[in-house]
Amino acid sequence: MEIGGAQRLLSDLLPLQMKQADVTLLVFKSVNNALVDKLVEAGVKVISLEVKNVYNPLIIFKLKKYIKGYDVVHVHLFPALYWVAFASGSVEGKLIFTEHSTSNSRRGKRWLLPLERLVYGKYSEVVSISPQTRTALNLWLGRECSREVILNGINVEAFAGAASGVQSSDSIVMVSRFAPSKDQETVIRAMRYIDADVRLRFVGDGPLMAKNIELAESLGLLHRIDFIGAADDVARYIAEAKVGVQSSHWEGFGLTAVEIMACGRPVVASDVPGLKQVVQDAGLLFKAGDPEELARTVNSLLGDEQLYLQTARRCADRAAEYDIKKTAEGYWRVYNG
C-alpha cells in the first residue's frame, strides 16, 4: 500500500470500522510502512495479491476468489475500479466504489465513455468525496451515477496532538505524491520570490519527483529545497513548518490541506474545485499555476504575525469539521442502507 491521500484515509478509517465489523484489506502490492503496521495492529487482515503489473487484466481472475463471502466489497481508486467491476459476478453483497478525484486521464478520451458507463454501472453505490467530485463524475458519464457524498476525514486529535509544543521554523511544507494531479513545480518556481532564508520541504514520492528535482537544480534552488520522499510521520513534518502548501492541478477533496489545518498551521492552496471548498474562508487561496501569486500569499503570512495567527486559528477550527469519525458514520450508513 503506497503512501497517498486515499491510503492515509484508509489507515484512519478501517480501524474505526473494525469496531463495527470484521474488515479485510486487499491490495495489489504489499509495502512495508507504518500505515500497514497500524492496520494490522488494529486487527485488520491485510492480503496482498503481489501482482507485478497492476494494469494487467488477468488480475480479474485472481480477484474472483478473494471477493466472495463478504457483506460489502468497497473499492478505491483505478485500476481496481475496473478489475473488481469485471469480477463482480463473485460479489455476494453490496459493491461500493469511492470516487476520489474531480478529473483523471480517462475523461479526456471520449471513446472510453461506453466502457466507463458499463464499469460504474456494476456498483451498487458510487460515493463521492465532495460535491464537486460528484458533479464532475456525473457530467462525464452523462447520468446520475453518484448520489452520495461522504467527506474525507482525518484523526484531528492525533494531528493536533503531534503539533502541540513543536517549534516551527521559517519553512514551507507540501505533502503530496509527485503525480500529474499535483503541482510541485509551481511551488518550486515560487521560491524565487520568497525570502532566501525560507526553506521548502516536499514530503512524498512518485513518478514526477526526478523531474521536479531537475527543475529545482536548473533554477539554482536545490540548496533551499529538501526532497524527503515518502514518510510515515507526516504530522511532524507539517508541525515543523511555518506554512503548509497544497498546490494542485485538480483535487477531489484535499486531505493534506485538512492535515495541515489540524496541526494549527495556515494552509495556502490552489483555487481549484474540491480543494477550494475545503480551504476557503479558513486558509488562503492562490490562482493555480501562478508562482508569483503563491509567493505573495506565503510572504504575507510570514511577514504579518497578526494575519498568520488569525489564519492559523481559522484553519484549526475548520479542520474540526472533517473528523474521521464522521466519515466512518457516513460509510456505515451506506453499508446498511
Predicted regions span which residues?
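A short, well-ordered alpha-helix in the C-terminal region of glycosyltransferases
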Residues: 293, 300, 307-321, 330-333
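Aromatic "clamp/platform" in nucleotide-sugar-dependent glycosyltransferases that forms part
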Residues: 230, 249
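A conserved mid-protein helix/loop that constitutes part of the nucleotide-sugar donor-binding site
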Residues: 4-15, 170, 174-193, 207-214, ...
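Short hydrophobic beta-strand element within catalytic cores of glycosyltransferases
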Residues: 26, 266-269
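Short His-centered aromatic/hydrophobic patch
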Residues: 75-82, 99
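N-terminal strand-loop element at the rim of the active site
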Residues: 1-57, 208
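Conserved acidic donor-binding segment of nucleotide-sugar-dependent glycosyltransferases
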Residues: 269, 284-291, 300-305
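Acidic anion/phosphate-binding donor-loop and adjacent secondary structure
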Residues: 54, 58, 135-139, 144, ...
